Amino acid sequence: MSNYFNTLNLRQQLAQLGKCRFMARTEFADGVNALRGKKVVIVGCGAQGLNQGLNMRDSGLDVAYALRAEAIAERRDSYRRATEHGFCVGDYQALIPQADLVINLTPDKQHAAVVSAVQPLMKPGAALGYSHGFNIVEVGQQIRPDITVVMVAPKCPGTEVREEYKRGFGVPTLIAVHPENDPRGAGMAIAKAWASATGGDRAGVLESSFVAEVKSDLMGEQTILCGMLQTGSLLCYERLVAEGADPAWAGKLIQFGWETITEALKQGGITLMMDRLSNPAKLRAYTLAGQLKTLMAPLFAKHMDDILSGAFSQGMMADWAADDAHLLTWRAETGESAFEKAPPFEGKIDEQTYFDRGVLLVAMVKAGVELAFETMVASGIVAESAYYESLHELPLIANTIARRRLYEMNVVISDTAEYGNYLFANAAVPLLRQGFMETLQPGDLGQPLPAEAVDNAALREVNQAIRQHPIETVGERLRGYMTDMKRVAVAG
């Protein structure tokens, strides 16, 4: 197997990177009909597997779970989750041959083995589904020509997929059909029905490609979604304690600060997030964000380049072959960091304090979101895809840190995201520690900014620059489809 993206010529690469179309709600008028009466078999029962299955069953589909024989015999977590929710469970040999749609929702590193095992068992003309295209694009898995290959990728952790569905809503979703595997032209109908069954059509669906989903997903999770949050958490906690802050208070300010700040981002983009600051603090955050973007632009570009070339995937798959030697080392190092070991703080921090004393946190969010978006768009990824893989998902990842700090974030995200997160943070932490953190001024972090006069012309120009950034333009339109979004922040 070889990297599928690298087998394409430049025109094909650009066409697939740039495939992105926001689908009208009328295109989902048939709902789940294309899958009604069909047998859907999900392989894997983790967060995405279980919660997508629950939604699909509640939408009237026939759903079962195929697990490895040893997982059933040993009654592992996946088996218990499926059976406790009343699903039919069987091994591959029992369930795969009767499936009309086999959905592979196992971790990325298991995809090659899983797909190699289920393919020979699939009946002629069946469909194979993914929620992340890594196996097709980066591994280059070859699928039988009679099999239709589709993707439905909710832009949310599995738990949120379920919770939004139960509210009568859904989460924004990308769908795609692999151009090499659509023998009967039925792929789009299957993908649309699957997206409807999970509730995605209620929140907005982008017709994308496997290539665009993978490359943008990898870039977002490595940089702003996980890498920047890890980098900022480690550096900001270190700075606060060095300046004499109570370690417990500092830990809470960082742990819940990301979530509180990005809740404003979720509701009104960078504009609303910056509007939560006082005028002097807004000007200072704008300046800090500009400095951060200048410093980090080469690092963001390197991650994008390595993702496009396949160098990132090649390195990660080598680590898979070495039993995750690097991943496990970096995970252990993160667990021993000062931020992770900070004592609990029993007092309350009111919501506005997270903004007033977290100007640097706001600046880091602004810089990271804009840089990730700009880098993806400059590489041929359409603005809508770049928005979903940067700004949209950030509050959801920040929420995991609020629950159990970086440990929870790295447990919830995929191993692929975790590996990329460490690569980014391992480079960004020393870069910013030496070239940026030492230049901070009083009021940037931990203390309110001293009162000072504001130049009206400067404030006007900053406000215009914030509002006119391309991510704000596309974000305002896409958020219009998500007016029922619930508030997720739990800070206190």
Swiss-Prot record:
What keywords were assigned to this record? Amino-acid biosynthesis, Branched-chain amino acid biosynthesis, Magnesium, Metal-binding, NADP, Oxidoreductase, Repeat
The protein's required cofactors: Mg(2+)
The family database entries (Gene3D superfamilies) matched by this protein are listed as: N-(1-d-carboxylethyl)-l-norvaline Dehydrogenase, domain 2, NAD(P)-binding Rossmann-like Domain
InterPro entries from the UniProt entry: 6-PGluconate_DH-like_C_sf, 6PGD_dom2, KARI, KARI_C, KARI_N, NAD(P)-bd_dom_sf
The answer to whether UniProt assigns keyword rRNA-binding to this entry is no
GO MF annotation terms: ketol-acid reductoisomerase activity; magnesium ion binding
Q: Does the keyword Glycosyltransferase apply?
A: no
Per its record, the protein catalyses: (2R)-2,3-dihydroxy-3-methylbutanoate + NADP(+) = (2S)-2-acetolactate + NADPH + H(+); (2R,3R)-2,3-dihydroxy-3-methylpentanoate + NADP(+) = (S)-2-ethyl-2-hydroxy-3-oxobutanoate + NADPH + H(+)
Locate the residues binding NADP(+): 45-48, 68, 76, 78, 108-110, 158
**What is its pathway?**
Amino-acid biosynthesis; L-isoleucine biosynthesis; L-isoleucine from 2-oxobutanoate: step 2/4; Amino-acid biosynthesis; L-valine biosynthesis; L-valine from pyruvate: step 2/4
Enzyme superclass (EC): oxidoreductase
Q: EC number(s) for this protein?
A: 1.1.1.86
Q: Single GO cellular component annotation?
A: cytosol
What function does the entry list? Involved in the biosynthesis of branched-chain amino acids (BCAA). Catalyzes an alkyl-migration followed by a ketol-acid reduction of (S)-2-acetolactate (S2AL) to yield (R)-2,3-dihydroxy-isovalerate. In the isomerase reaction, S2AL is rearranged via a Mg-dependent methyl migration to produce 3-hydroxy-3-methyl-2-ketobutyrate (HMKB). In the reductase reaction, this 2-ketoacid undergoes a metal-dependent reduction by NADPH to yield (R)-2,3-dihydroxy-isovalerate.
Q: What's the protein name?
A: Ketol-acid reductoisomerase (NADP(+))
Originating organism: Edwardsiella ictaluri (strain 93-146)
